[in-house]
């Protein structure tokens, strides 16, 4: 059929923002993919990760219309890169939980200054067989929660200046990193394919919905690719 006009799509997006519907839609898309045995929920793992995205309105002062140039609901994300250099980004953080095939199961968006570990409980499913995460989520609270859920702890360990990681934990972290790499692929899709390395809107609610729509598009595209490559799985062997 005909592609709707941009104004129609904009009004639809605004309705999603107003009624906070993107998460329900993502859940429904995943339910339908699960019903077709494209997403497999039994025995699934959960890979949680986060990425900073720059606020499109990150300058100081006011524009010609008198409105602030800076998105006040964004925040500074500061992280040390692999070379030990601190990198600062004024914007938001997109937090996702994906399965081993790269389908997004949970997602949320926060101001950039919110620590990644704060959203751990938002991303936990409760029925995952294992949780993969980086050292930002390494804590006794995380380990205790995973034990209550009966979930295997695949969270990387932290090293400290006066207590560096043992050789065993370094090897463990390296093994976890191989699986965790799958959790970063949606971010590459968002930034390179969907042009979302920077936000397009002012405010948390609008950006939450924008990245929620991106998550839905990501899962639909991946589901279509699975169908093209493999066809519909035999339900007798899919579970």
What are these regions (language model features)?
Residues 214-221, 225-228:
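A short, amphipathic alpha-helical segment
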Residues 54, 59, 159-161, 222:
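Short loop/turn segments at secondary-structure transitions that flank enzyme active sites
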Residues 125, 129-130, 135-212:
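Helix-centered, glycine/charged polyanion-binding patches within enzymatic domains
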Residues 193, 224-239:
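A short, flexible helix-boundary coil/loop motif
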Residues 21, 108, 114, 132, ...:
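Short linear functional motifs in flexible/disordered or boundary regions
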Residues 2-148, 214-217:
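Polybasic low-complexity intrinsically disordered regions
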Residues 87, 93, 191, 206, ...:
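A general lysine-centric signal
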């Amino acid at each position: 059929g005909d592609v709707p006009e941009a104004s129609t799509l904009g009004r639809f997006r605004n309705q999603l923002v107003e009624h906070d519907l993107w998460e329900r839609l993502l859940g429904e898309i995943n339910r339908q993919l699960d019903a077709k045995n494209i997403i497999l929920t039994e025995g699934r793992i959960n890979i949680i990760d986060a990425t900073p995205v720059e606020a499109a309105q990150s300058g100081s002062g006011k524009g010609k219309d008198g409105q602030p140039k800076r998105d006040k609901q964004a925040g500074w994300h500061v992280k040390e890169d692999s070379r030990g250099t601190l990198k600062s980004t004024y914007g938001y953080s997109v937090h996702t939980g994906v399965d081993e095939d790269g389908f997004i199961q949970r997602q949320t968006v926060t101001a950039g200054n919110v620590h990644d570990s704060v959203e751990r409980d938002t991303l936990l499913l409760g029925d995952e067989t294992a949780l993969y995460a980086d050292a930002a989520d390494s804590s006794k609270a995380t380990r205790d929660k995973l034990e209550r859920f009966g979930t295997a702890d695949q969270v990387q360990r932290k090293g400290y200046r006066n207590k560096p990681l043992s050789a065993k934990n370094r090897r463990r972290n390296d093994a976890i990193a191989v699986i965790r790499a799958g959790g970063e692929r949606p971010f590459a899709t968002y930034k390179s394919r969907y042009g979302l390395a920077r936000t397009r809107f002012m405010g948390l609610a609008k950006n939450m919905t924008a990245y929620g729509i991106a998550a839905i598009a990501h899962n639909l595209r991946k589901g279509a690719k699975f169908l093209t490559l493999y066809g519909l799985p035999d339900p007798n062997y899919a579970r």
